[in-house]
Each structure stands twice: as C-alpha cells, then as structure tokens.
C-alpha cells in the first residue's frame, strides 16, 4: 500500500501522504496512474471540451513535475559539456530550450488530440514505457530517479502486458511512437551519461506526445 501511495504522490497531483517514496511496485504504474491522470481529461474531451482544455487538465493532474523534467532536459541538451549540462538540471532558471520544448510539445499534442481513448492509451503507453526503460538504465546520481530504477529492475516484466495491449490495439501507431520516444531518450541519456528524475520526466512527456501524434497512422 505504501508503494502505491508513492506512485500517486510522485506521478499525480493527488495528495497521498507519503513520508518516504518506495517504488518497489513500479510495475503498477501503467495500471494505476493513467485512469487518474488521463481519465478526467478524456471525460472532459468526451463532454465537449476543446483539446487545449483537456490536455491542460491532464498536465495539471500530473502535478507538472514531468513537464518540468522536459524543460530541464531540453535546457541541458543545449550545453555540450556533460558536467555543465548536469548542472543545468539543477538550475531553477528556465532557458530558451526548455521554453521551446514545453510550448512545442503542448502545441503538437493539442493539435493531434482527437479522442478520449487516444489520451488514455497515450498515458498507459508512456507509463509502461518508463518502467521498462528504467529497468535497463543507470542513474548518474542518487535521488528519485535512482530509487525508481531500483524498483523497476525487479518488477518491469509485470508492466509489459500493458505495453502489449497498446501494441495490439494500435500496432503502427505504438511502434512508431516507441521508436521516436526511445530515440529521444537515447539522446538525453547519452548526453547526460545516465538518467535521473528529470530524464524520466522528459521521457514521460515526449512518449505521450509521440503516441498522440502517431495515433493517426
């Protein structure tokens, strides 16, 4: 129960009252969190809200933590030196790369959003992917990212059924999104020499947007 509360605390805006984060049940991420995060957005879209309103609601339900990771990593990618790039992740100031990444992903996602199911499956896809990828990643520093990697390494096969279902439902879209998301993750991973919480937040955002865009394939 403590582990599930940790998932809610870290991946949603829902207050779970967790004193210590425990990701031993990281495998449950694609099953527990997407309905809570994308469910309200999908319902809003079904009731007639615009894609802009629906996607903003989805982002708010995540607590904006992962969007912050996207912006931080985008800023870090603008710096060639690895140590300086890692330092940029800790800088609270926002650079041009981060601003562009946030605006671009939002614009592309909202322009491509067409159905409630699309939002739900995109969230399941991103959550299943991060568990699987984290299991084969190494942290470049202690922290939440390292804790998540430890949890994912022992449980990641349990997240594969969620990814398999998504692939069966939309094969071309999912495989295309998978290729795009993994390529973008590889760029950040190689540039920074590993992963941390920001890199995983970046992966969550770009993989969700990639799936939303490729949905139309």
Curated annotation (Swiss-Prot):
EC identifiers of the protein: 2.7.8.26
UniProtKB keywords: Cell membrane, Cobalamin biosynthesis, Magnesium, Membrane, Transferase, Transmembrane, Transmembrane helix
GO molecular function, one term: adenosylcobinamide-GDP ribazoletransferase activity
Pathway(s) where this gene product acts: Cofactor biosynthesis; adenosylcobalamin biosynthesis; adenosylcobalamin from cob(II)yrinate a,c-diamide: step 7/7
UniProt keyword annotation of Transferase present: yes
Gene Ontology, cellular component aspect: plasma membrane
Pfam short name (any one): CobS
Origin superkingdom: Archaea
Transmembrane intervals: 6-26, 39-61, 95-115, 116-136, 162-182
GO biological process: cobalamin biosynthetic process
Major localization class: membrane
Cellular localisation: Cell membrane
Described purpose of this protein according to its UniProt entry: Joins adenosylcobinamide-GDP and alpha-ribazole to generate adenosylcobalamin (Ado-cobalamin). Also synthesizes adenosylcobalamin 5'-phosphate from adenosylcobinamide-GDP and alpha-ribazole 5'-phosphate.
Protein name: Adenosylcobinamide-GDP ribazoletransferase
Organism of provenance: Pyrobaculum calidifontis (strain DSM 21063 / JCM 11548 / VA1)
Gene transcribed to yield this protein: cobS
């Amino acid at each position: 129960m403590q582990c599930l509360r940790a998932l809610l605390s870290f991946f949603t805006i829902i207050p779970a009252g967790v004193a210590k984060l425990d990701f031993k049940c990281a495998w449950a991420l694609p099953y527990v969190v997407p309905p809570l995060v994308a469910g309200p957005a999908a319902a809003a879209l079904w009731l007639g809200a615009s894609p802009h309103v629906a996607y903003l609601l989805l982002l708010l339900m995540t607590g904006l933590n992962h969007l912050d990771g996207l912006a931080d990593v985008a800023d870090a990618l603008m710096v060639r030196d690895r140590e300086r790039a890692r330092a940029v992740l800790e800088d609270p100031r926002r650079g041009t790369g981060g601003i562009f990444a946030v605006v671009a992903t939002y614009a592309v996602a909202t322009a491509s959003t067409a159905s409630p199911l699309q939002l739900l499956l995109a969230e399941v896809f991103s959550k299943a992917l991060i568990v699987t990828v984290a299991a084969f990643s190494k942290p470049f520093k202690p922290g939440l990212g390292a804790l998540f990697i430890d949890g994912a390494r022992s449980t990641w096969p349990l997240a594969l059924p969620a990814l398999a279902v998504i692939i069966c439902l939309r094969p071309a879209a999912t495989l295309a999104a998978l290729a795009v998301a993994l390529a973008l993750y590889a760029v950040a991973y190689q540039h920074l020499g590993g992963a941390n919480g920001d890199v995983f937040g970046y992966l969550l955002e770009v993989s969700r947007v990639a799936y939303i865009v490729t949905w139309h394939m």
